Every structure is written in C-alpha cells, then in structure tokens.
Amino acid sequence: MKKILLAIACLWAACISCSEDTKIGAPDEILPDYVLPQGDASKEANDRIQQIFDTYTSYVLYNYTEKDAFWTQTAAGGGVQIYRAIMGESRYVDAMLDYIQDIWLQFFPEEFLKKGGMPYRVFLADSIYLDRGWGKTLYNYRVNGNALIIGGMNEDLTAMDAVTKRTRKNELLGAMWDYYIAQGLLNVPDEFYKDTDYENAPALPLAGENLEAYRKRGFLPTFNSYSGAQEEWYWGDYPWTQAKENDLKSFMLHLRNQTDEEVAWFLNNPEYELIQKKWNILIDYYKKEFDIDLRKIGNTTF
C-alpha cells in the first residue's frame, strides 16, 4: 500500500512540475544580413540586385562599411598593412552591374552560380588598395572568404576601352577560377595528365631543337604576370618540382585568355599532337561537366 501511495505522490509531483513550466514562445525572428534595396541607386539597378538575391541567395552590395566589405591587417617590418575598399557613387551601380555581367557572370550557367559560383557577398567598390603606411598598392578585385570585392565603380567605367576590359576579365576570371577550385566547385580531369611525362625533366627549352622537343612533349609557355609576354615556365630545377601545376596553369591561361587566332600557332601544328589532345580534354570536360565554354571566355575581347 505504501508503495502505491508513493507512486501516486511522485506522479502528482511530476504533473505539478510540468504545469508550472514556462511555456515556450515563438522562436526569435532571424533577421537578414542586409536589407534590399540598399539605397538610392536607380530602380532598375535595385531590381536587378534583388533578382540576383532571389536567384542565387547572394548579396550585391554598394552601401556598406569598409570593415564589413574587407578589413585585414598584417604586421610587416614593424608596421601595419591594411586592405581598404572605398565605396563608389550609387549613380554608377547600373554600369557596374553591366560590367560584372560582361567580364564574369555571363560565362557561367545559372545552376553553377546557384551552387556557390556567385559568392554570398559581392561588394561593388570605387577602388581597392593595400595601405602600407608609406604607400598604396591598387587592386582591381580582392577575394575575401566567401566575399568578392570588385573595384572600378566610378566615372572611368563607362569610358573603359576594350583592351582594358579584356585585361580585367582575364584577371578576375583567373582569380575566380582558383576560388572555384578551392571551394570544390570545379576540379581537374585526371585524363589531362595521363600521357604527359612529369618524371623525366626535359632539356631547358631555350630555343631550337630543345624548344621543339619540349613542345612535342605537350608543354605550352606561360605569361609573365607583369608584362603579359609569353615565357617558358620551365626555366630550371625548381619549377619542374611543380610541373603538373605549372602545366595545367599554362593551358588554362591560354584557354581563358587567348583568342583562336592567338593560339593557332600550336593548334595548327601537326607536330604538337599532345598539346592539342590536352587542350581538347579540358575544353570537353568543362563543357560536359559544368556547361562552361572555355573558348567563349578566351574569344571574348569586347
């Protein structure tokens, strides 16, 4: 009997405890990171930005704090280096949206952009620079985590000539391609490396027979990052330790940056069969797997 009474008492206590619990209210509202439209850009521009967000869940921002867009400081030589992004005037937002469409977004399919090809935040800036304390280094873009900052939103944008615009396209797409690889959005087909000998270093391709033998082994030149002139990436023992990476990079630079006319010298040479095979492997792979037309990118000169 005592056990029955004890059980009833415990049950009654539990019921009382439950009845005195505070009721759970509605969950806190999750606020968006940014509110669109942001400011006084044209209605058309704000509508385009809203459409980008609705499609890709990515913010294109022209009204922001510098720290929000990009703020990194590093110690160097006892000083502090700070990256800065300067906002542009909102009257140039329309032209800037056209600009990023022309040099970047048009080359990637919607499904790819939805999966992360469009970074979560894209900041439109007048200019971007590294403040070293004693001077500034200007940049046309910076990739910062899952954000991209693009400079140029100023009066010079609408007057940009075709040569400059092509250079900006090549710079930005090179950076974004590396970003996509790092994020796992793109990869490299193993078939590209299959028939190339990366074990036995060739003779230095300085000129003449050595250069021809080097080409027949399937290697292209690269481009000087400052002058833009073609040069051989294999100039000694060290670059050969990264032969695979250098080989792929040289092909991708030609594929993305050069027109059909500019690459005819190796595509039309019957002696360069391996170069042509590797070339077509990359074109076919990215078109089939990602619907990215590398030759459309290379042939776009504005």
Give the residues covered by each predicted segment.
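C-terminal motif of bacterial Sec signal peptides marking the signal peptidase cleavage site
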Residues: 14-17
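Structured domain cores in non-transmembrane regions
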Residues: 131-166, 278-299
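Solvent-exposed, acidic/flexible segments
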Residues: 86-97, 143, 161-170
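Active-site recognition of the HExxH zinc-binding catalytic motif
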Residues: 148-197
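Auxiliary, metal-adjacent structural segments of Zn-dependent hydrolase domains
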Residues: 94-146
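Positively charged n-region of N-terminal signal peptides that target proteins for export
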Residues: 1-4
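Acidic/polar, low-complexity intrinsically disordered N-terminal segments immediately downstream
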Residues: 19-111, 266-302
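Metalloprotease/metallohydrolase-associated module, dominated by Zn2+-dependent proteases
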Residues: 199-302
